[in-house]
Every structure is written in structure tokens, then in C-alpha cells.
UniProtKB/Swiss-Prot annotation:
It holds the Pfam family Cytochrome_B. Component of the ubiquinol-cytochrome c reductase complex (complex III or cytochrome b-c1 complex) that is part of the mitochondrial respiratory chain. The b-c1 complex mediates electron transfer from ubiquinol to cytochrome c. Contributes to the generation of a proton gradient across the mitochondrial membrane that is then used for ATP synthesis. One of its GO terms (cellular component) is mitochondrial inner membrane. Heme b b562 binds at residues 83, 182. This is Cytochrome b. It comes from Bugula neritina (Brown bryozoan). The chain crosses the membrane at residues 33-53, 77-99, 112-132, 178-198, 224-244, 288-308, 323-343, 345-365. SUPFAM superfamilies: a domain/subunit of cytochrome bc1 complex (Ubiquinol-cytochrome c reductase), Transmembrane di-heme cytochromes. It is found in: Mitochondrion inner membrane. It comes from the Eukaryota. One of its GO terms (biological process) is mitochondrial electron transport, ubiquinol to cytochrome c.
């Protein structure tokens, strides 16, 4: 009966295709981060729905409603803390997942890679919109500074900024729009994730050696589902430790102050996972140039499949690309540090050097 349902029922067929999925035998724990991203997405959607039930998208009540959730809603402090900190876990997983893809040349699977980069861009946008919603000092000023960057677009810039703001400054209309989009985008991410998985199942998974592994495969369940379960347990231990012991560890102290348009924070900065892109933005003296560099810091991933194909499909077999990859990781971490510092010497000069190095490394990796 069970086998009949798995073969003939549409939902059963989908489940069966996952269970019977042929995976390369030699994939490591780094291939588990895709399933961890799915877990983080489900966690974010569920906690976000509960938070949306109590949040008020109004500039006079948003900050108080966030405090009300933490103080008076049953387990509201837990739901809010899980939502805020699992966003950090989400980005740890997504950066590791992307890094693994670059290292093992997963960009050779073009359709899967393109959808994945689009997912990264929309996830970054969604996280930024969510950062604005508590309507603290850093939320307000981050919204003002980042949206104002669009004014660098020739001819249409100012009109686009006013359209996004819903007026001539960040106001109630802006907050309402950001709230609506922040609620909508996770469902768009879910749809794109399904596309990502469909393309992945069509092309088959990559492996550490970068070789054709069609003759050396194992069923996903129970072997790799058990391996993924270990990653899930470790992720929940990490998330639980932060949520229960240091819930405000990754939250900017300025955001515990209600938004005040008349007082500018000493140093405006986004969440830690945006700091590398923010450092690249600040390193270019010209406004339009900075915006283009910011966009290209992520959009350059779209061009990886079009660059020269490496002799070997995996950086583990290519000493030059292996060194270049770890230089890229180091560069990314240094940019994250620079983004958290004020725009003054020597941080400004280091940021400019690291920005040039960041884009140069991609060029080095693209050459045979």
C-alpha cells in the first residue's frame, strides 16, 4: 500500500524522488548547508508570522509594539530572539554554502547557480527590510542612508527615492511598504528555493573531486538524511545557546533607542552580515561608483559561469585557485571588520585596498 502511494500519488512521487535521490558517495559535511538553509527559512517564516500578528507598522507605535512583544506576549521574547538570531545563522549558512560552491566550481551548473545567486540577493534585501521594522535609531538611519543611494541613478534617481519613501523623507508610508515587502519576500524565496532544488536534481550534485560520479552514488535517505540531521542538531544547539544566553549579542545597542530624525548616530552601520558590502560601498569616493561597486560585489557571482572555465572542476585540485579562494575568504572577513569601523584613517585606506583585492581575486580565479 505504501509503495503504491509513493508511485502513483503526486505528493508521494515528490517525496519518493527525494528519498531515492542518487547522491555522490564522497560529498562532505559542506554539502549539508543547503538543508540547513531550508531549516533556517522555515524557522524565519514561522516566527515571522507570529511576530506579524502583534507588530504595528506605524512610526509612532512600531518601536513600542516590538517592546510589547518582548515583554507582554507569551513567549514573545523567545520568538523575537529566534527570529533575529536565526537571521544571523541564515547568513552564516548562506555564505558557507556560496563559498563551497565557488571552491568546488558549482557555478558550472549554470541554472542552479543563477537561481542561487538570485536567492542570495533577495535574501539580503529581505534582511535589510526586516532590520528597518523595529524602528530604532539604527533602523531609521540605515533606511535613510541606503535608500538614498538610489538617488545616484541618473535622471530617475530622485523620483525613485521619493516613490520608495512615499514622500520627501523616510516616513510612515516607507515603514508600511517595507513591512509588506518583508512579509512577502520569504514566500518568493521559498518558490525560488524550489526552483533551485529542481535544477539541482536535474543536473545532479557536484562532489569534492569535481568528477562524474554517476557510477558512484548512494540513496539520499537514510545515509545523507542522517548526516544532515547531525548538522540540524548542531545548528539548533548554536542558535539555542545564543537565544537563551546572549540574545542581544548581535544586535546594535543604538537600536534600543527609538528612531529620532533629529539625532544622527555617531557611526551608522547595518547588521554584521552586510558589513563587507557596506565597506565596499564606502571605499569608493564617488556616490554612483560606490553604488555600482556595492551591486557588483554580489552580482559578480552571476558572471562566474561565463568566465574562463578552469582546467580542473574543483579548486582542491588547482593550487592557484585554492590560494585565491582562501585569500577571498580572508578579504571578506577583513572587509567585515572595516565595515564596522568609522570612515577615518587607516580604516578608509585599508577598505579601498581590500575592495580592489576583492574584485581582483575573482579575475585571478577565472584564468586558467
Amino acid at each position: 500500500m505504501k509503495n503504491q502511494m509513493m508511485k502513483h500519488n503526486p505528493m508521494g512521487k515528490m517525496a519518493n524522488s527525494l528519498i531515492q535521490l542518487a547522491c555522490p558517495k564522497n560529498i562532505s559535511a559542506l554539502w549539508s548547508f543547503g538543508s540547513l538553509l531550508g531549516l533556517c527559512l522555515i524557522t524565519q517564516i514561522l516566527t515571522g508570522i507570529f511576530l506579524a500578528m502583534f507588530y504595528i507598522p506605524n512610526i509612532y507605535q512600531a518601536f513600542d509594539s516590538a517592546i510589547y512583544i518582548s515583554r507582554d506576549v507569551n513567549f514573545g521574547w523567545l520568538i523575537r530572539s529566534i527570529h533575529a538570531n536565526s537571521a544571523s545563522m541564515f547568513f552564516i549558512c548562506i555564505y558557507t554554502h556560496t563559498g563551497r560552491g565557488i571552491y568546488y566550481s558549482s557555478h558550472q551548473m549554470k541554472e542552479t547557480w543563477m537561481v542561487g545567486v538570485t536567492l542570495l540577493l533577495i535574501t539580503i534585501l529581505t534582511a535589510f527590510l526586516g532590520y528597518v521594522l523595529p524602528w530604532g535609531q539604527m533602523s531609521f538611519w540605515a533606511a535613510t542612508v541606503i535608500t538614498n543611494l538610489l538617488s545616484a541613478i541618473p535622471y530617475l534617481g530622485s523620483t525613485i527615492v521619493n516613490w520608495i519613501w512615499g514622500g520627501f523623507s523616510v516616513s510612515n508610508a516607507t515603514l508600511t511598504r517595507f513591512y509588506a515587502l518583508h512579509f512577502l519576500f520569504p514566500f518568493l524565496i521559498s518558490a525560488l528555493s524550489l526552483m533551485h532544488i529542481i535544477f539541482l536534481h536535474q543536473s545532479g550534485s557536484s562532489n569534492p573531486l569535481g568528477l562524474n560520479s554517476n557510477n558512484e552514488t548512494m540513496k539520499f535517505h537514510i545515509y545523507f538524511s542522517a548526516k544532515d540531521l547531525i548538522g540540524v542538531i548542531l545548528l539548533w544547539i548554536m542558535l539555542g545557546s545564543v537565544v537563551l544566553l546572549k540574545p542581544n549579542l548581535l544586535i546594535d545597542p543604538e537600536n534600543f533607542i527609538p528612531a529620532n530624525p533629529l539625532v544622527t548616530p555617531t557611526h551608522i552601520q547595518p547588521e554584521w552580515y552586510f558589513l563587507p558590502m557596506y565597506a565596499i560601498l564606502r571605499s569608493i569616493p564617488n556616490k554612483l561608483g560606490g553604488v555600482l561597486a556595492l551591486i557588483m560585489s554580489i552580482a559578480i557571482l552571476y558572471f562566474l559561469p561565463m568566465m574562463n572555465k578552469p582546467i580542473t572542476k574543483s579548486a582542491s585540485m588547482n593550487p592557484k585557485n585554492k590560494i585565491a579562494f582562501w585569500l577571498l575568504v580572508t578579504n571578506f572577513i577583513v572587509l567585515m571588520w572595516i565595515g564596522s569601523k568609522p570612515v577615518e584613517s587607516p580604516f578608509e585606506e585599508i577598505g579601498q585596498i581590500m575592495t580592489v583585492t576583492y574584485f581582483s581575486i575573482y579575475m585571478i580565479m577565472s584564468k586558467n
